[in-house]
Structure formats: C-alpha cells, structure tokens
Regions:
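Helix-loop-helix hairpins in multi-pass membrane proteins, especially solute transporters
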Residues: 66-204, 230-231
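Helix-loop junctions on the cytosolic side of multi-pass membrane transporters
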Residues: 183-202, 248-257, 424, 502-511
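Hydrophobic transmembrane architecture of multi-pass small-molecule transporters
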Residues: 405-505, 510-528
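Cytoplasmic loop-to-transmembrane helix junctions
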Residues: 50, 135-142, 391-398
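Transmembrane core module of solute transporters
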Residues: 12-66, 104, 146, 165-166, ...
Length: 528
C-alpha cells in the first residue's frame, strides 16, 4: 500500500515543504512581535493597554475560531481554506507593516489571526493527504518541528531586522516569500476528496467564539485588572454561560459545529488533555526562559533568542524519530516517554542561578527539545487516529484549540504565580537580610568603605551600598521565584504523563481499505 501511495503522491515532500513554509512564517511573525513592540509603541505613542490589545487582536480570532475553520475545511475543501487563509494572513501582515495608526495595527492583527486560524488546522490534513499511513507520523513530526522553528526564528532574525532596519520590515519582508508559498500551494496541493455537509451551525459558532474570546481576554487582563475585579469576574461568567449555551446548541442540532460525540472517544479526550497540559507547561516554560536569560543573566534580546537554538535544533533533528515511533508503535509509548523527558527538563531549570553558564542551559534546552520531539507528533497521531475522515478537520481544530487555550492559561497562571512568588521571596529575604542584621551590616560596611576610598561622601556611600543590597535581595528573590515556577511547569508535564497513560493505540486496519484515492484514506494528525 505504501508503494502505491508513493507512486500516486510523487510530490509528497514538496507538499510538506509548501505547507511548512506557511507554518514557519506564521510562527515567525507571531513570535517576533515581542521584539518589535517597543518600537511600535514609539511610532504610534501606544499606551500599555494598546500593547495588550495588539497581542489579543491576534490571539482572539485565532484561538476562538480554530474549530470553525477546521469544520469549514471539512465542508468546502481543505486546500481552499489553506490557500485562502495564507492569502488573508499575508495581506494582513503586509498591512500591519504599512499601518498608519494604533487602531490599524490592531485591526490588521485581527485579520492575521483569522488567516492563521484558517490555514493551520487544514495544513495538518494536507500533509496527511500527501503521505501513506505508515509515513504520516514522521511527516507530521517534521512539519511540527518546522512550526516550532518559526517561533524560535522570530526573536533572532526578527531581532536583527528590528535593530538594524525597522519594525515595518519585520512584517513586509515575509510578503515575497509568502507570495511564492501561495502560488506553489495553488499549483501543487490537491483538494480533499471528502467534503461534508454544507450546513453551518452559525449559532453554535457564535456561542463558541463568545466563550473563547471572553476566556482569552480574562486570562490576559486578569493580572493587570485583578482576578477578583468586576471586569474579570464578568468575563469568566460570560465564558461559562456562553460555553453552556454552546453545549446546549451542539447537543440538539443535526449538524453541530463540534460533534460532542468526539469526546466519547476516550483516546481523543485523553490526547486533548495531554495537549492542554503540554502547552500549558511548554508556553509557560518558553515564556519564562527568555525572561530569565534577559532579566537575571543580562542577555540582550537577540542573544536570548539565539540561545534557544539548541531547543529547536534538537526538535528538528529528532521530530522524525517521534513520528516513526508513532507509525510503528502507536502514539501512547512515545507520548508518555516524551512527557517524562519534558517534565525532567523543565524541573532541571529550577536549579539555575544568576551565575549559571550557557552550556548547562543549552543542555537543558536540548533535553527539552528531545521531550517535545517525542511527544508532539505521536500525541497528534493518538488524538486523530480514531476519528472518521469526514470529521478530521473539526477534530484537528478542536485538538489545536485545546493546545492553544492550554498555552494561554499557562502563560496567565504561571506569569501570575511568578509575580506572587517574587513578592513572597522578597519579603522573606528582606526580613532576614535587613539593615540591622549582622550580615547586612558587614556587607554595607564593606561596600561603603570601598566607595569612600574612591572619593564618595560617607552618607552618599551608605545610600549607594543600601541600594546595592536591595538590588541583590530583589535579584535573588527573582531567581527563587523562577525556580518555583519552573517546578510548577514540571508538575504540569507530569500530570500529562498520567493522562498519556489513558491513551489507547488503535491497531491499523489490514486490507479492508477500499480501492480509492489516497486522499480518501486520510487519517489526519497534527501539531501546533
């Protein structure tokens, strides 16, 4: 079967390249925005609230519409949705670079998120269409590694562009590459043969978007507004009520947007839980590590971005191995093994200090990359293998939704935890090391004496010495807080191990397959 499939799909690696191109570009643009934000602020006089909405403008349409876009791919064709999404994303990216006000930046960022949501879930099925069943895991592993590569290239290449050119070039520079990707997609990609019912559940979609939008805003605004503020509590209430309304509509409509029967599938449900926990830990970790490198170790933004290369390098090299293991042994074993390695890697970060050299950090990042490489594609295989092909698009949309929400929850909760633990450790250390303690007096006297020898007045020298002591306390409190939160990310990954044990591998069917085109044999899997 593999041989015949290969004969029918001679362009399978070209398809993988084309789909990976769009995925890399979206990850690159999304991650490089952090580098450009301060420059955008200066150009348009952004307030911090404007900056938050620049981020949310992408996250809300992307996260809230993933299942809808997957469903539309099932209904109207996955190639159509992929190409249309890439066109929308490219045009919006170009317009962000040409923006003339803060409002237009936010508006075009919304279209960016919408375009990414259109092509991402459908990209998975296009890769699956191009490869025979015994190679799909490996192919999706490679695709997933390139998806992660885009996220790491943003802070590095994007950092150089922002520093030596300008922030507008960050967005406009990808347009020619994306245009080539659009043309190649139209010429090479094949449309999916299976198109489901054209009926669209608009009411269910409305409630789903309302629920997820409220949740994303609440998670990202909660720390600033206060988790118990009327605004945030109201958003959480809206989230719950909209979700209940969505479940009610979906359980009673003949053509639901998300077939709730999917969650009767224990393996699909378990894989979604693992995906949620994995991205909660992963996004939390990737949020913390660059901040640790910059704020604690004093790395420049570009150096901090380049420092993540061992992570992406190990992922790219080993992702095909994770896919091969999934093809041969099923998704459960490599998923559990990968989550175990990921948990160990995240836990090892808690021992870092302000004196940690780069080599030990690089080794930790490599271990983290190995864990992710073994987890991602096998987990996607496990999530999607038992779903009927006509529900593959919406299934991959739901799977990506769980990962996306998990990532948002992880950043919000772990970011808040970091602030709380830093306050806690600052208080403890300040009580222990105060101006009246013997240790503090000895330190202050030493610093003060050195400053006086250099010609500083006694009172001024004391103020500088005291400020230095407070800075040391604050830095050590921050190091300890980072350590606590890294342990929390490891615990989340460990919970993923438990959920992974609930996955049941599906035995591959033997020659009961009808003699149809390979595109009809798709068992799509995916990774974000």
């Amino acid at each position: 079967m593999a041989d015949s499939n290969e004969l029918k799909n001679p362009n399978k690696y070209f398809v993988l390249f084309i789909v990976s191109l769009g995925t890399v570009l979206s990850g690159y643009v999304a991650s490089s925005l952090d580098i450009a934000l301060s420059n955008i602020m200066n150009t348009f006089g952004f307030t911090m609230d404007n900056v938050t909405w620049v981020l949310l403008a992408y996250m809300i349409p992307y996260g809230a519409t993933l299942p809808i876009m997957g469903k539309l791919g099932d209904q109207f064709g996955r190639k159509k949705m992929y190409v249309l999404g890439l066109i929308v994303f490219t045009a919006a990216t170009m317009m962000v670079g040409l923006s003339w006000s803060s409002s237009t930046v936010i508006l075009f960022r919304m279209f960016q998120g919408m375009g990414a949501a259109m092509f991402f879930p459908n990209a998975m099925t296009l890769v699956s269409d191009a490869f025979p069943p015994n190679e799909r895991g490996q192919a999706l592993g490679m695709w997933g590694a390139f998806a992660a590569a885009g996220a790491v290239l943003g802070p590095t290449i994007g950092g150089y562009i922002v520093e030596y050119l300008n922030w507008r070039m960050l967005f406009n520079s990808i347009v020619p590459i994306a245009a080539v990707g659009i043309v190649l997609s139209i010429m090479v990609l094949k449309e999916s043969d299976t198109i489901s019912s054209k009926k669209i559940d608009y009411l269910g979609g409305l409630f789903l978007v309302s629920s997820l939008s409220s949740l994303i805003i609440a998670l990202n605004k909660g720390s600033k507004e206060g988790w118990t503020s009327l605004y945030i509590v109201g958003l959480f209430i809206c989230t719950v009520l909209s979700l209940l309304a969505f479940l009610y509509v979906e359980s009673r409509t003949a053509e639901p947007l998300v077939d709730l029967e999917l969650f009767r599938n224990g393996t699909f449900t378990a894989a979604n839980i693992v995906g949620f926990l994995t991205f909660m830990a992963l996004n939390g970790g990737l949020f913390l590590i660059p901040f640790f490198l910059r704020n604690i170790l004093g790395y420049t933004p570009i150096r901090a971005g380049v420092s993540l290369f061992p992570l992406i390098g190990s992922m790219i090299i080993l992702a095909p191995l994770g896919g091969k293991l999934a093809d041969k042994a099923g998704g459960k074993i490599p998923t559990v093994l990968g989550m175990t390695i990921l948990s160990i890697a995240l836990y090892s970060f808690h021992t870092m200090t302000d004196q940690t050299a780069y080599l030990p950090i690089a080794l930790r990042l490599i271990l983290m990359g190995i864990g992710l490489a073994l987890t991602m594609s096998p987990l996607s295989t496990a999530a999607m293998a038992t779903l009927p092909k006509e529900k593959a698009g919406v299934g991959s949309g739901v799977f990506n939704l769980f990962k996306n929400v998990g990532g948002s929850v992880g950043i919000a909760i772990l970011g808040t935890l970091l602030d709380q633990r830093q306050i806690f450790h600052t208080q403890i250390l300040s009580d222990y090391v105060n101006a009246s303690s013997d240790a503090a007096q000895h330190f202050l006297s030493s610093i003060q004496a050195g400053l006086i020898l250099n010609g500083m007045q006694t009172n001024e020298a004391y103020v500088v010495a005291l400020s230095t002591l407070k800075g040391i306390v604050a830095k050590q409190a921050a190091v300890m807080a980072y350590g606590d939160v890294f342990q929390a990310t490891a615990a989340l990954a460990a919970l993923g191990i438990i959920a992974g044990m609930l996955i049941k591998d599906v035995k591959k069917p033997v020659p009961q397959e009808p003699v149809v085109s390979d595109a009809e044999e798709v068992v799509p899997v995916g990774i974000h």
